[in-house]
Amino acid sequence: MQTRYDLILGSRRFSNYLWTLISFSGGIGFLLAGLSSYLGVQLLPFGNTETIVFIPQGIVMTFYGTIGILLSLFLLLNISLNVGGGYNSYDKSTGAIQIFRLGFPGKRRKILLQYKIQEIKSIKLSIAEGLNPKREIYLQTKDQRQIPLTRVGEPLLLSQIEEEAVELANFLNIPLEGL
């Protein structure tokens, strides 16, 4: 096998779908409660909004509802554009490494980094435990640049990230640092 291809999951993670649904549902609820207090009409199918005074509670609920809906639309846009998604491609026959990621719309929506295997010094494994654990694999070039190879989001299991780093270092036939 001369080629290795790793897909990188971007913003199309389960947690993003869940937070989009939660913020949209909450936003609709708050917006309808605020509008109900303004119009004097029961817009919510549950609960009683007759006791909510428009100033100040109704205005605040309308504001929070609008913010919740806008946040859910932003998350939905991220999911549909797959921001952060892409691939890592390693081809031993041509000696090329390609790292591709998608970003936000604009001039630099598509990011493609290309390196030769000869330019790579090592695979670096960075592990930091604590309240916000960080477990990442980096491609370290001979000019000391570190290019992250792992996806953003929830950290992988320690055994899983170590196994991935060892497999990649063995495949590229370069040393592994930080293990």
Swiss-Prot record:
Record-annotated membrane-spanning stretches: 21-41, 59-79
Q: Which GO terms describe its cellular component?
A: chloroplast thylakoid membrane; photosystem I
Kindly list the cysteine pairs connected by disulfide bridges. Answer: none
> Is the Plastid keyword given for this protein?
yes
Enumerate the UniProt keywords alphabetically: Chloroplast, Membrane, Photosynthesis, Plastid, Thylakoid, Transmembrane, Transmembrane helix
Q: Give a yes or no for keyword Ion transport in this entry.
A: no
Main location as per UniProt = plastid
What's any GO biological process attached to this entry? photosynthesis
Record's subcellular location = Plastid, Chloroplast thylakoid membrane
What is the protein's membrane topology class?
Multi-pass membrane protein
* HAMAP family, per database record: Ycf4 (MF_00437)
| Sequence similarity | Belongs to the Ycf4 family.
Q: What does this protein do?
A: Seems to be required for the assembly of the photosystem I complex.
What is the name attached to this protein's record?
Answer: Photosystem I assembly protein Ycf4
Q: Which organism is it from?
A: Rhodomonas salina
